[in-house]
Every structure is written in structure tokens, then in C-alpha cells.
Amino acid sequence: MGRKKESFENMLEKLETIVDSMDNGEITLEDSMKSYEEGIKLCNKLYKVLKDAEGKIKILEDNKEEDFESS
């Protein structure tokens, strides 16, 4: 059975939780390192989602201009 794809908002919320836990300074160095690694992975996933969305918007905008010009 496949794993359900996590939403952008859920990933962003997890990242914010990680940042908050690291900012308050109440976690160990080892936990900070694990959190940092998880945060970097989440950042990369979030960046990919944003780049994909940007690409889709660009395609839609280009198509809109072509449709307008051919009218």
C-alpha cells in the first residue's frame, strides 16, 4: 500500500514546530541535530512543491497569452 502524500501545509507546520523547538533551546544537541536534518528534508520537499507550482502557473500563463493572441 502506498504512502499518502503529505500536504504542503502539513509539512510547513512540521517545519515550524521543529524551528520552535530548536529556538527554545530545551532540546539536547543530539535531538537538535536530528531536528535540523528533518528540517532540511522538509525544506527541500517544500521547495520542490513550490517550484512545481511555479512551473504549472507559468504554463497556464503562457497558454492564456496564446489563447488571447489567437482570438
Swiss-Prot record:
It comes from the Bacteria. Keywords: Cytoplasm, Exonuclease, Hydrolase, Nuclease. Its EC number is 3.1.11.6. GO terms for cellular component: cytosol; exodeoxyribonuclease VII complex. Pfam families: Exonuc_VII_S. Gene3D superfamilies: Exonuclease VII, small subunit (1.10.287.1040). GO terms for biological process: DNA catabolic process. The keyword Transmembrane helix does not apply. It catalyses: Exonucleolytic cleavage in either 5'- to 3'- or 3'- to 5'-direction to yield nucleoside 5'-phosphates. One of its GO terms (molecular function) is exodeoxyribonuclease VII activity. It is found in: Cytoplasm. Bidirectionally degrades single-stranded DNA into large acid-insoluble oligonucleotides, which are then degraded further into small acid-soluble oligonucleotides. HAMAP family: Exonuc_7_S. Heterooligomer composed of large and small subunits. Belongs to the XseB family. This is Exodeoxyribonuclease 7 small subunit. It comes from Clostridium botulinum (strain Langeland / NCTC 10281 / Type F). The lineage of its organism: Bacteria, Bacillati, Bacillota, Clostridia, Eubacteriales. The gene is xseB.
